C-alpha cells in the first residue's frame, strides 16, 4: 500500500511553517516518519534555509528531501498565491521506491545532466516509473536536458515545473536534504508497483486557422503564408487589441507543433510559446522557440473561460483513466500565469480537481513553466496545468 499525505502552512516563521506542514502530512499518511518529502515554498523562506531544511528533516525523519521555491502552492485544501505559503508531501511504501536527485550547476550543463540522469534512473522492471524535475527557471534550458535524457535512454515520462518566485528575490531556489541553492535542478525519481496517469490542460484558445511559416531564421519569423509575419498577426487583432499592440502581445501567443515530424497544430498537439518581440519596419515576429520553414503555426489567445472548459475536459479524462480507483496521491504543476491572474478569482484549479476527483493527497505549485509528456516525448509547456495521478496495484 502506498502511503502519502500532504500539509500546508502560511506561517511567516520558516521553522514553524515547515514543521506544521510536514506534521500534517505525516498525520494524513498515517506514518510516523517518511521515506521521502517533497516541499514547495515561497521564496521568502529561502532566506532561512537552515531552518527550512532542518525542520523538514527532523519532523519527517528522513534526509530524502527535494523541492523548490514557487510563486504559489496548492494542496487539496486550496491554493496560496504569494505570501509565505509552504506545502509538503510525505511518501512511504514498500511498493514505491523514491530516489532524490540534485545537480548543480545547471547553466550550460543541460546535456551532461541529461546523460547523468539516464545513468542514474535506468529502465525499471517495475510496473511504473516517474521522474519529477524542478529546474531553476532563470538558469538553463530544460528542453536540452529533456532531449539529452531521451537520446540516452529513450522515453521516460517526466513531469515537473520551473522553480519560481514573486519577482522580488530575482532568483529561484532548489531544495535538497543538504540545503537550498540556485542554478540547480532538483528531482525525484519514483519506481515500483504503481501507475502514473498524466494529463495536461491548456489555458489558450486558437484564434486562427493553421498556417505555415514560409520564411524564418532561428526564432525570427519573417513570413507566414508568404505574407509578412507581423501583418498576418495584426490582421487577427480585434477591438481594443487592434489599438494596443503591447496589450495584444500579453494575451496572444503562437502554437507550434509538439512533434515536428507530424507537423500538426490540431487540438492537443501544439505547444504554446510567447511572442517575445516584433520589428514593425521589417514585419518580423520573434518567438520563444527556434522554428523552421514549412512548419505549421497557429495563433492562440489566453482565455479564462476557455481554460475552465479545458480543465473540465482534462479532469474527465482523468476520471476515465482511474476507472473508479482512488488516487494514492497526485501532483499538479500549474503555470504562474494561471490562477487568479487568469480566472479573476483564486482557487479555481484546486476546486475543480476536488469536485471531479474527491479528496486525496495532492500537492502542487505555480511554476515558471511546466514539464510533461505529449505522445512519446517530453516537452516544456507554458500557460498549462499538468495533473499527475498515481494509483497503486492495490487501488
Per-segment meaning from a language model:
Residues 1-36, 41-50, 55-57, 63-64, ...:
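Small-residue-enriched flexible segments
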